[in-house]
C-alpha cells in the first residue's frame, strides 16, 4: 500500500468529513465501528506476534455478531466482552502513531485500524469480510429485530398461562420482555408504539377480541383458533355515498329513467304543439336540465295541470267525450270538430321583446270567402295555435240557454247579471291565467258568415253578413266611461284600443274584441255604481248597426243577447252615462293583468269586399302603466 502523506500535527483540527470515530461504537449495535484516535496512528511495522491473529479474531467476531443480530434478547455486556477478547484492544495500546494510513482506508477497516499493509495473505480478506455484517444489518425490519408487532403480540399472548391478555397486559409484556421498549414505558415515549399495537390488534385477523365477564374490565385478546391470516386484513371503510352499492343502484336507475323519458320526449317532438314550444320566454324554452330533479324523483302524471314544461300536444277527442259536465261550455263551445290548444299566458308576454317575437309569428293568411276553412288549416307556424270551433252558422244550440244573460229592451248599456259557471277543466288551466277562447281570431278574420252563435246570437234576422263583418272588426276596448264613435265603412274599419283622455284604468288586452282578463278577479262581482269619472274596463263592441255590450265571465268576453235595431245607435256617445254595469274594481286592481306591464294590441287591416286575402299586421305600442 502506498504511503499516504503525513497528517497534521496533533493540535490541528480534523476535517469534519473524516471525523474520527469514538471507541464505544466499535462493539455496540447495530454495527461495530473502529475508533480512530488522531493523536495515535497505526505503525507500518507492528509487533510480529500479533500478525497472524487478526484473521482468526475477525472470524470469531463475525460469527458472534451474526448470533447477536438474530438473538432478540442480548446483553450489551456480552458484546463488550466479545470486543474485549478481540486483539484490537492490545494493538491499540502497543501501536505508536503512524501517519501513513489514509483516513478513508481507516474508515473502511472494521475494528483493525492498526493492521499494517504488509500483512500476510491470510489477513488480507479481513476488511472485505467486515463489510458483510453491514449488509445483513440492513435487512432488519424494526429497531428491536426482525419480528413485527404482530409477532411480538403473538408471543405475548402465547406466553400467558391462559393464552389471553388484555391491552394493558400486552403493554407490560412489551416493556418487560423486549429490550427496545424497556426505556419507553413512560407515557411520553410510549404513545407511538402503543398506538401501533392497537392498530395491529384491530386490523389483523389472527387476533380475536373476547368480552370480559367482569363489569368495567378490558376485553381479552386471544389468538384466532382458526389461524386467520398472517398478513393484515383489508382496510374497513365506513359506507358513504361514493362506495355505497345501494346509492349506486338507485343512481343507475335514475339515469335509465331519465334516458327513457328523453327518448319519449324526442319521439313526441313531431307533434304540432312542439313547433312553437320554444318561443322566447315560454316555460318550455328552458332546458330539460332545469327539471332534472323533478323528472328523476317525481314521475309526471298524465294530468295537464301537473305538466312541468307546459307543452301540450293537440288531441282530437271524440264528440261524446266533450259532452261531460266537467267541460266548460265557455271554453269549449259546442261544435262538430273540437281541438284543444295551448296558449302562452300573458304573464309570460310581459316584455316587448317577447311580444314582438310572438306577434311577428302571428300571420294568419285568410282563404277566400267561398271556402270554409278547416280546423287543420289554422295550425300555423306561429306562437299561438288557434283552432276553430264550428264555423257554420246553424240553428241556435239547445245548450245556449246556459248563458243566463238578462235581455233588456232598447238600452244599449244595461246591467247584465251573469251566471258564473265553475271551471272544472284542469287541463285548460295549465295554459295560463289569461286564456283566450280557441278559434276567435280565425273566425273573426276569415269567416264570411256571421260569427259563432255563442258570440252573436241570431236574434235579429235583418243582420246581414257585411254588417256582421263590420261588427267583428269594430270590436274594441273601452277603458273609460266614455265610448268613442267609429265609422261604419266596411273597407276602412280598424280595430285598436284607444285610451281616453281621462285617467286610464288597468287595461285589459283585447284580441279582436275578446278580453283576456284574470279568471278569478271578475268572478267576484259586486254592485258598485259607477259615474262618468270612474273608469270602466268593460269591453264594448260597437258597429254601425248597434251596440253590443260585452260581459266578462271567467275571463272571457261574451256578447250579451240584446236585440237592438240599427237606427238606435247614437251618433255621439261622449255624453252617455254608464250607470248600470256591475264591476268589482278592487278585484281588477288587485289582480293586475301583468306584473311588469300591460299589453296593447293594434290590428291595422283594410277589409276588401267579401274577401280577406291579406295578413293581419300587428304593431306593439308602449305599455300603459296601470
UniProtKB/Swiss-Prot annotation:
Specify residue ranges for compositional bias: Polar residues: 298-310, 484-494
Q: Which InterPro entries does this chain map to?
A: FH_FOXO1 (IPR047408), Fork_head_dom (IPR001766), FOXO-TAD (IPR032067), FOXO_KIX-bd (IPR032068), TF_fork_head_CS_2 (IPR030456), WH-like_DNA-bd_sf (IPR036388), WH_DNA-bd_sf (IPR036390)
Biased composition range(s): Pro residues = 1-11
Q: Which residues form a coiled coil?
A: none
**Which regions of the protein are recorded as binding DNA?**
144-238
Write out the biased-composition intervals (Basic residues). Answer: 248-259
Q: Where is this region: Disordered?
A: 1-57, 90-142, 218-319, 484-519
What Pfam families does its record include?
A: Forkhead, FOXO-TAD, FOXO_KIX_bdg
Q: Which domain of life is it from?
A: Eukaryota
The entry's keywords: Cytoplasm, DNA-binding, Nucleus, Phosphoprotein, Transcription, Transcription regulation
Any single GO molecular-function term of the entry would be: chromatin binding
Q: How is it modified after translation?
A: Phosphorylated by AKT1; insulin-induced.
Provide the primary localization. Answer: cytoplasm
* GO cellular component terms, semicolon-separated: cytoplasm; cytosol; mitochondrion; nucleus
User: What does the record list as GO biological process?
Assistant: cellular response to cold; cellular response to hyperoxia; cellular response to starvation; energy homeostasis; fat cell differentiation; intracellular glucose homeostasis; negative regulation of apoptotic process; negative regulation of DNA-templated transcription
Where does it live in the cell? Cytoplasm; Nucleus
User: Which residue stretches does the UniProt record annotate as biased composition, category Low complexity?
Assistant: 37-48, 101-133, 262-277
Role noted for this protein: Transcription factor that regulates metabolic homeostasis in response to oxidative stress. Binds to the consensus sequence 5'-TT[G/A]TTTTG-3' and the related Daf-16 family binding element (DBE) with consensus sequence 5'-TT[G/A]TTTAC-3'. Main regulator of redox balance and osteoblast numbers and controls bone mass. Orchestrates the endocrine function of the skeleton in regulating glucose metabolism.
Name of this protein: Forkhead box protein O1
Amino acid at each position: 500500500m502506498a504511503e499516504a502523506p503525513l497528517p497534521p500535527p496533533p493540535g490541528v483540527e480534523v476535517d469534519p468529513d473524516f471525523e474520527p470515530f469514538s471507541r464505544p461504537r466499535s462493539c455496540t449495535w447495530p454495527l461495530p465501528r473502529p475508533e480512530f484516535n488522531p493523536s495515535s496512528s497505526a505503525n507500518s511495522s507492528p509487533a510480529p506476534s500479533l500478525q497472524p491473529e487478526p484473521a482468526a479474531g475477525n472470524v470469531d467476531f463475525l460469527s458472534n455478531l451474526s448470533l447477536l443480530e438474530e438473538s432478540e434478547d442480548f446483553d450489551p455486556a456480552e458484546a463488550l466482552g466479545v470486543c474485549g477478547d478481540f486483539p484490537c484492544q492490545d494493538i491499540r495500546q502497543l501501536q505508536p502513531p503512524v501517519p501513513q494510513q489514509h483516513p478513508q482506508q481507516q474508515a473502511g477497516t472494521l475494528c483493525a485500524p492498526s493492521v499494517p499493509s504488509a500483512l500476510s495473505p491470510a489477513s488480507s480478506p479481513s476488511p472485505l469480510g467486515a463489510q458483510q455484517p453491514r449488509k445483513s444489518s440492513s435487512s432488519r425490519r424494526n429497531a428491536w429485530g426482525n419480528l413485527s408487532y404482530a409477532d411480538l403480540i403473538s408471543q405475548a399472548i402465547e406466553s400467558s398461562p391462559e393464552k389471553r391478555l388484555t391491552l394493558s397486559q400486552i403493554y407490560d409484556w412489551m416493556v418487560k420482555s423486549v429490550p427496545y421498549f424497556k426505556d419507553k414505558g413512560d407515557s411520553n415515549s410510549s404513545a407511538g408504539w402503543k398506538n401501533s399495537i392497537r392498530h395491529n390488534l384491530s386490523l389483523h385477523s389472527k387476533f380475536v377480541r373476547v368480552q370480559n365477564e367482569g363489569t368495567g374490565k378490558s376485553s381479552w385478546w386471544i389468538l384466532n383458533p382458526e389461524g386467520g391470516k398472517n398478513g393484515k386484513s383489508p382496510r374497513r371503510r365506513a359506507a358513504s355515498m361514493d362506495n355505497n352499492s345501494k346509492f349506486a343502484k338507485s343512481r343507475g336507475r335514475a339515469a335509465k329513467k331519465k334516458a327513457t323519458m328523453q327518448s319519449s320526449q324526442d319521439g313526441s317532438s313531431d307533434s304540432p304543439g312542439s313547433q312553437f314550444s320554444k318561443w322566447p320566454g315560454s316555460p318550455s324554452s328552458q332546458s330539460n336540465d332545469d327539471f332534472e330533479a323533478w323528472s328523476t324523483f317525481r314521475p309526471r302524471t298524465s294530468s295537464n295541470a301537473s305538466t312541468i314544461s307546459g307543452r301540450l300536444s293537440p288531441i282530437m277527442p271524440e264528440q261524446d267525450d266533450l259532452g261531460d259536465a266537467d267541460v266548460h261550455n265557455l271554453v269549449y263551445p259546442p261544435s262538430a270538430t273540437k281541438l284543444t290548444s295551448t296558449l302562452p299566458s300573458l304573464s309570460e308576454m310581459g316584455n316587448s321583446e317577447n311580444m314582438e317575437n310572438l306577434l311577428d309569428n302571428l300571420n294568419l293568411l285568410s282563404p277566400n270567402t267561398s271556402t270554409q276553412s278547416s280546423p287543420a288549416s289554422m295550425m300555423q307556424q306561429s306562437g299561438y295555435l288557434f283552432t276553430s270551433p264550428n264555423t257554420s252558422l246553424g240553428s241556435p244550440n239547445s245548450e245556449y240557454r246556459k248563458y243566463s244573460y238578462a235581455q233588456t229592451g232598447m238600452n244599449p248599456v244595461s246591467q247584465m247579471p251573469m251566471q258564473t259557471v265553475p271551471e272544472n277543466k284542469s287541463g285548460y288551466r295549465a295554459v295560463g291565467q289569461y286564456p283566450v277562447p280557441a278559434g276567435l281570431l280565425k273566425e273573426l278574420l276569415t269567416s264570411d258568415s256571421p260569427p259563432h252563435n255563442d258570440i252573436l246570437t241570431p236574434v235579429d234576422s235583418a243582420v246581414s253578413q257585411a254588417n256582421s263583418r263590420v261588427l267583428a272588426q269594430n270590436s274594441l276596448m273601452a277603458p273609460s266611461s266614455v265610448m268613442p264613435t267609429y265609422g261604419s265603412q266596411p273597407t276602412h274599419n280598424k280595430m285598436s284600443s284607444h285610451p281616453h283622455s281621462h285617467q286610464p284604468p288597468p287595461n285589459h288586452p283585447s284580441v279582436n274584441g275578446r278580453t283576456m282578463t284574470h279568471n278569478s278577479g271578475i268572478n267576484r262581482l259586486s254592485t258598485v255604481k259607477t259615474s262618468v269619472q270612474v273608469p270602466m274596463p268593460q269591453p264594448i263592441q260597437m258597429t254601425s248597426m248597434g251596440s253590443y255590450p260585452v260581459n266578462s265571465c271567467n275571463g272571457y268576453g261574451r256578447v250579451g243577447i240584446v236585440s237592438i235595431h240599427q237606427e238606435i245607435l247614437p251618433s255621439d256617445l261622449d255624453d252617455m252615462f254608464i250607470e248600470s254595469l256591475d264591476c268589482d274594481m278592487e278585484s281588477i286592481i288587485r289582480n293586475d293583468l301583468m306584473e311588469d306591464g300591460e299589453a296593447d294590441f293594434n290590428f291595422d287591416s283594410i277589409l276588401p269586399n267579401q274577401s280577406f286575402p291579406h295578413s293581419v299586421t300587428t304593431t306593439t305600442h308602449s305599455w300603459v302603466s296601470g
